[in-house]
Amino acid sequence: MRVAILESIVMPAGHEVEFDRILINELKRQGHEPVLFVPENFPFKVDYGVDIVYLEGGEVVTYAGASKWKKPFLSILRERRRRSWFISAAEKIKEYNIDALIIPTGTYRYIKALLDTPLKDSKAAVHVIFHGIGKGEMDRFIKQAHRANAYKNVYLDVISLRDDMLRPNLPRVRKILPPV
């Protein structure tokens, strides 16, 4: 299978970089062909040794060094670009014959954005991975999960030891045990 990983978080090192490396290595180990989908001019810190597909919609938006007055503007810009990247990803899935798409670091905002774009109707399975659900975010997550439930190829995978996000009427919300 050709599996695309849509990465839009820029970090010099740490969690996101390591998680992408783990995903890519495991996909290769299982015989899949991983591909990275990233925003235009994405500044890679690591060579993952896979094909790179650049998404239209603008560069990554980061809060690094931004004043508290600039952050609300950047937040709006980030949301607009996320939707643009998802629209582009829906097109690239067809163009590059992608079988599944993984969004490795999601929040309820990612679900909301995904559901506003053609990506929700993708023939490829779309997996949004959540690294836990923060205190106070459960209600927003469940609300968006109910909306996503209408789309049979959208999966919400939560890395957690808890199972309070699971609901019988949300079959594509799934728990993934963390590697502890």
Which residues fall in each region the model found?
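Short N-terminal targeting/anchoring amphipathic segment
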Residues: 71-82, 88-111, 124-129
